[in-house]
A protein has these predicted regions:
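Alpha-helical segments with a strong preference for the paired helices of cellulosomal dockerin domains
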Residues: 249-272
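Sec-dependent, cleavable N-terminal signal peptides
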Residues: 1-26
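Short, glycine/serine-rich, charged loops/turns that create anion-binding
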Residues: 16, 45, 268
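Negatively charged
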Residues: 23-243
Length: 272
């Protein structure tokens, strides 16, 4: 009798373990009003979370925290370590118009390898002073329109990991980033596929390229200047991340006598 009970108990435990293992993890976000935090998870614990939970991969027009107005209350966004297992296909509008958002932590847990749309992702984040997108995999992204529009407190962006070979739309990507001074890019940056880029740098009044090219309202605001600054011969608004070596004034990736010459020319030009 005792052996039979133990056997049944073992079978029951095994069945429970199988059921638990079979439960599929899901990607979702949970808003907690008590600390005005929106947290992203990828697990099987959604039903036990305290707060309001939202589906992901819904598309920009159907994001739950946008349609119910929660976005205006969020002050902090957190990516839980579990979210590293998620593979979202869109991040469009995720933080759109979060005008009170002050910080985003755990961004390294956001895997963007399957994302095709990043439009409006950070648009309107007026209180955000920094955002770490340096690890983003953008090899499948097609849309980046208004991605950082109206991020008025950002002073620098590191886009050195970006591969933009498939991006077709960059309209107003950095528009109204009125305090943005430096945009770092790497070898993966390209505008070859870009079809739409109007007002890409509209009102980026503080922007300076790696060799001193400054934003000017008389310059084209489309993709024309969306490349690494080559100085007067090929002016651009970006800075080569690989050339940001201390003392590398001319951005050629090394420190030598030519940097002294470039520095003298820069000082004599009066652009400083």
């Amino acid at each position: 009798m005792k052996k039979a009970l133990l056997f049944r108990l073992a079978v029951l435990v095994a069945a429970m373990m199988c059921a638990l293992g079979a439960a599929a993890a899901e990607a979702y976000a949970c808003y907690t009003p008590s600390n005005t935090t929106l947290t992203f998870y990828y697990d099987i614990q959604r039903s036990s979370r305290t707060g309001t939970t939202y589906d992901l991969n819904t598309g920009y027009a159907d994001i739950g925290w946008q349609t119910d107005g929660t976005n205006a209350s969020v002050t902090k966004v957190v990516f839980d370590p579990s979210f590293a297992g998620a593979r979202p296909t869109t991040t469009s509008g995720w933080f759109y118009d979060m005008r009170n958002l002050e910080s985003i932590t755990g961004m390294s847990y956001l895997n963007t390898s399957e994302v095709t749309d990043m439009s409006y992702m950070f648009a309107g984040c007026e209180k955000l002073t920094s955002v770490d997108v340096s690890h983003f995999n953008t090899s499948k992204v097609i849309y980046m329109g208004r991605m950082f529009d109206l991020c008025t407190r950002l002073t620098s962006l590191d886009l050195s990991s970006f591969n933009t070979s498939h991006v077709a739309e960059m309209r107003s990507m950095f528009s109204n980033c009125s305090n943005l001074r430096t945009i770092y890019v790497g070898s993966g940056w390209s505008t070859a596929a870009v079809m739409y880029s109007t007002e890409m740098f509209w009102n980026c009044i503080c922007l300076v390229g790696g060799q001193g090219t400054t934003w000017n309202s008389s310059n084209p605001t489309d993709k024309t200047y969306a490349h690494i600054d080559g100085g007067t011969s090929n002016p651009g608004y970006f800075t080569d991340k690989n050339a940001s070596l201390r003392g590398d004034v001319n951005g050629d990736g090394s420190v030598n006598i030519s940097d002294v010459t470039a520095l003298i020319d820069y000082l004599l030009s009066g652009r400083w």
